[in-house]
Amino acid sequence: AREGYLVNKSTGCKYECFWLGKNEFCDKECKAKNQGGSYGYCYSFACWCEGLPESTSTYPLPNKSCGRK
């Protein structure tokens, strides 16, 4: 299994979060069907996800750099 920052596939940005550590939003996003992770929490103001399948993309995406062209 992989781990990494969840990434928004349309923008290339990380999922932002402000409540560090245990974070319901990150945990929910991580476990969502399209991500398939086992546990998510907030690390350095972005959602970090563990237990991801190899098919799930994580930040940074090769062709998108979040707002920078």
Swiss-Prot record:
The keyword Nucleotidyltransferase does not apply. The modification Cysteine amide is found at residue 66. Expressed by the venom gland. Residues 1 form the signal peptide. Disulfide bonds join 13-66, 17-42, 26-47, 30-49. Residues 67-69 form a propeptide. Belongs to the long (4 C-C) scorpion toxin superfamily. Sodium channel inhibitor family. Beta subfamily. Beta toxins bind voltage-independently at site-4 of sodium channels (Nav) and shift the voltage of activation toward more negative potentials thereby affecting sodium channel activation and promoting spontaneous and repetitive firing. This is Neurotoxin Cex6. It comes from Centruroides exilicauda (Bark scorpion). The lineage of its organism: Eukaryota, Metazoa, Ecdysozoa, Arthropoda, Chelicerata.
